[in-house]
UniProtKB/Swiss-Prot annotation:
Swiss-Prot/TrEMBL keywords: Disulfide bond, Glycoprotein, Protein transport, Repeat, Secreted, Signal, Transport
Post-translational modification: N-glycosylated; more than 90% of the glycans are sialylated.
Tissue-specific expression: Detected in brain, especially on brain capillaries (at protein level). Expressed in isolated brain capillaries.
One GO process term, biological-process aspect: vitamin transport
GO molecular function: vitamin E binding
Localization annotation: Secreted
Domains (record comment): The second albumin domain forms a deep binding pocket that contains palmitoleic acid (in vitro). Palmitoleic acid is most likely not the physiological ligand. Instead, this pocket may accomodate the covalently bound lipid moiety of Wnt family members.
Protein name: Afamin
Length: 608
């Protein structure tokens, strides 16, 4: 390919020092050299990703100016890498360039970051990223003919602009994913622009690219949120569960070594350090492929692919078969007399090994459920090990595991039952109401997006054999989007509590959330009047958006409304919309208690 070459990982600013250890084995040296091989065309892409993700508001012209600064800097360091400025890490150099561009920090409100140095500055830039990109204009779309003409006129500029638009709308997506997306998009443009049916071709090619980007974004944001809010121990627990389920024959010692590379990868990638992210991900993939015989029989084809394609292939590869003779229980954690002593001697290693053994034996469970069981086990041992007869106590811990799993399973069964009975549209309205009750502070666009994601999760999973793990995993990712990546995101006390108290049990926490009643309630008549005016306002707008806004406003103003009440009102407004006639007897939708609440609210309003 002309611009994005998938034959090796892209690396730039070679003279800059990085924190990863230098390899010593010949095969590792070869891989390291391949990773460090500089491909000049791709310097621009990595720079665009970094600048666009750190300052999403920056214009394309501003990003292009910064890229030129980067290229000049690279050339100076190539010519003389002993210059003091060339000893910086790539990420520090990138942030220096952002801060040094005249007027840019003030214009885009990140000057407070430029007053910091080192880790505090890197963290500040990270916290400055915005997951909700509603402040950006809609993604620019071109007619397929115009798109192809622009691509033929100047393919490099066309692809640079595409990379800029995608990167700033996906500020937490790792650089290797964005590079792969851009490469696939270039392949699509090259192919489709030669076709008669260009629009059909682009649609077919775009679907898997969009799906890959969306899935990667959701998972990476969730894991980075866990790292930022709960620290490296929770991140390690997630990775132990994920890798043990996928590669059940890997030994615990080998897994521990692999996860050292994985943890390093997430630290750099989550922070937005594009160079560290690419290099460390390359190291993880190389580690897996160099030991594939002892890790998995399912990844041989993946390891033969081009480097950027390997990761996606390994992620999507089937789970390896459970080793023969592996029992469903590991006795050392429930039957041994020395459980408490082993826990006390090295708690981190002990519980990591527990997750490893339990996960490889129960690949049917979701990652969140495996973390819940681990938390139950930790709490149970805390109690048992303080008793006179600990062994007699913790022998019954399996009962607690089963109770926890049954609670989670019941939630999934209820959600899939709703999916089967309600249909997609009604189900989305159900979740829209549910999310709005819990978090009325969120903008409508975000609430609609969350409800769509839940419906998509159930649509994907509720007909599968591994329904439970699939739904629980994807539903947890939706909550990860609600909670956000940054520690400084706050919604309301109840939601914040669920998001920040216990990563493993946040889904259970959300399930029991009541409506946030801190919102003020207008009278029923004022509510109906406002909703009717909005409903009948002539706008060039999709009817579905009006329906969504109707429900969101209804619930924001009346958080105590029941399912029957909002459904009744929704039906009445829908029936009246054709002629925008008066809504017939809207008050009849409300129970006496609801009417009373509305009257009390009206009385309160008069007192102000």
């Amino acid at each position: 390919m002309r611009h994005l070459k998938l034959t090796g990982f892209i690396f730039f600013l070679l003279p800059l020092t990085e924190s990863l250890a230098l390899p010593t084995k010949p095969q590792d040296v070869d891989h390291f050299n391949a990773t460090q091989k500089f491909i000049d065309e791709n310097t621009t892409y990595l720079a665009i990703i970094a600048f666009s993700q750190y300052v999403q508001e920056a214009s394309f012209d501003e990003v292009e100016t910064l890229v030129k600064v980067m290229l000049d800097y690279r050339d100076r360091c190539w010519a003389d890498n002993t210059l003091p400025e060339c000893s910086k890490t790539a990420n520090d150099a990138i942030q220096d360039m952002l801060c040094d561009m005249e007027g840019l920090p003030q214009k885009h409100n990140f000057s407070h970051c430029c007053g910091k140095a080192g880790f505090p500055r890197r963290l500040c830039f990270f916290y400055n990223k915005k997951a909700n990109v509603g402040f950006l204009p809609p993604f620019p779309t071109l007619d397929p003919e115009e798109k192809c003409q622009a691509y033929k006129n100047n393919s490099e500029s066309f692809l640079h602009l595409y990379m800029y638009e995608v990167a700033r709308r996906n500020p937490f997506v790792f650089a290797p994913v964005l590079l792969a997306v851009a490469a696939w998009f270039e392949e699509a443009a090259t192919t489709c622009c030669e076709q008669q049916q260009k629009a059909t071709c682009f649609q077919a090619k775009a679907a898997p690219i969009t799906q890959y980007l969306k899935a990667s974004s959701s998972y990476q944001r969730n894991v980075c949120g866990a790292l930022i809010k709960f620290g490296p121990k929770v991140l390690n627990s997630i990775n132990v569960a994920v890798f043990s389920k996928k590669f059940p024959k890997i030994g615990f010692k080998d897994l521990t070594t692999l996860l050292e590379d994985v943890s390093s990868m997430y630290e750099g990638c989550c922070e937005g350090d594009v160079v560290h992210c690419i290099r460390s991900q390359s190291q993880v993939v190389n580690h897996i492929c160099s030991k594939q015989d002892s890790i998995s029989s399912k990844i041989k084809v993946c390891c033969e692919k081009k480097t950027l394609e390997r990761e996606a292939c390994i992620i999507n590869a089937n789970k390896d078969d459970r080793p023969e003779g592996l029992s469903l229980r590991e006795a050392k954690f429930t039957e041994s007399e020395n459980v408490c002593q082993e826990r006390d001697s090295d708690p981190d290693k002990f519980f990591a090994e527990f997750i490893y053994e339990y996960s490889r034996r129960h690949p049917d469970l979701s990652t969140p459920e495996l973390l819940r069981i681990t938390k139950v086990y930790m709490d149970f041992l805390e109690d048992c090990c303080s008793r006179e007869n600990p062994a007699g106590c913790y022998r019954h811990v399996e009962d607690k595991f089963n109770e926890t799993t049954q609670r989670s399973l019941a939630m999934v069964q209820q959600e899939c039952k709703q999916f089967q009975e309600l249909g997609k549209d009604t189900l989305q309205r159900h979740f829209l109401v549910k999310f709005t009750k819990a978090a009325p502070q969120l903008p409508m666009e975000e609430l609609v997006s969350l409800s769509k994601e839940m419906v998509a999760a159930l649509t994907t999973c509720c007909t599968l054999s591994d329904e439970f793990a699939c739904v629980d995993n994807l539903a947890d990712l939706v909550l990860g989007e609600l909670c956000g990546v940054n520690t400084n995101r706050t919604i309301n006390p109840a939601v914040d509590h669920c998001c920040k108290t216990d990563f493993a049990f946040r889904r259970h926490c959300f399930e029991h959330l009541k409506a946030d009643t801190t919102y003020e309630l207008p009278s029923v008549s004022a509510l109906v009047s406002a909703l009717h005016t909005d409903w009948c306002q002539p706008r060039k707008e999709d009817l579905q958006n009006k329906k969504h806004r109707f429900l969101v406003n209804l619930v924001k103003w009346m958080p105590g409304i029941t399912d029957e009440e909002w459904l009744c009102l929704f039906t009445k407004f829908t029936a009246a919309r054709e002629e925008c006639s008066e809504v017939q007897e809207p008050e009849s939708c409300f129970s006496p208690e609801s009417s009373k609440t509305g009257d009390e609210s009206q009385a309160t309003e008069k007192q102000r």
